[in-house]
């Protein structure tokens, strides 16, 4: 006959239950996030790769474009949930691409985050004037980027930051 374990807690959840719940919650968040497709438009292959890998690690699906023209073409065929748009790109820069996306009936509501090395107030104003939903300066603070993305994709985010 096996002796009764004095530390057994019959009917009680295991001690590691909170950790299991946290892991389950994290899996739920990643499952929810994975339905979101983010387009990263950046002519720097290194920047695009770094941002893409980080977003994929966070559970997002990611596509990339090397210039504004490609970003518009990809957005038109895939309808991403959000676009991270570098401002200084060849062929068509991020401001021009954002302007054209905002003029397109089928794309205009996609949140666009401007990503640039230019942090001046005038440059930021120009980006908001063409319709960006958020603004990040390089080097990118990845936590801030993820918080901004989460806000813009949330039901209350409505594609723009609160004033």
List each language-model region with its residue ranges:
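Non-catalytic signal-transmission and effector/linker regions of two-component phosphorelay proteins
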Residues: 1-37, 143-163
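Short, glycine/charged-rich "phosphate-handling" switch motifs in NTP-dependent
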Residues: 133
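Receiver (REC) domain active-site loop signature in two-component systems and cognate sites
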Residues: 89
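Charged docking surfaces used in two-component/phosphorelay signaling
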Residues: 49-57
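Active-site beta3 strand of CheY-like receiver
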Residues: 78-84
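Short hydrophobic/Thr-rich beta-strand motif most characteristic of the beta2 strand and flanking loop
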Residues: 59-66, 74, 136
């Amino acid at each position: 006959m096996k002796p009764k374990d004095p530390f057994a807690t019959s009917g009680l959840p295991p001690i590691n239950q909170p950790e299991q719940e946290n892991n389950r919650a994290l899996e739920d968040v990643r499952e929810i996030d994975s339905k979101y497709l983010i387009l990263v438009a950046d002519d720097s292959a290194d920047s695009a790769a770094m941002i893409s890998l980080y977003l994929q690690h966070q559970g997002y699906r990611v596509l990339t474009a090397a210039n504004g023209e490609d970003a518009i073409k990809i957005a038109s065929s895939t309808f991403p949930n959000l676009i991270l748009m570098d401002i200084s790109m060849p062929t068509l820069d991020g401001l021009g691409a954002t302007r054209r996306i905002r003029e397109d009936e089928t794309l205009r509501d996609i949140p666009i985050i401007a990503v640039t090395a230019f942090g001046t107030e005038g440059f930021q104003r120009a980006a908001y004037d063409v319709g960006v939903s958020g603004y990040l300066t390089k080097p990118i603070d990845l936590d801030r980027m993820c918080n901004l993305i989460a806000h813009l994709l949330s039901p209350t985010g409505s594609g723009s930051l609160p004033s």
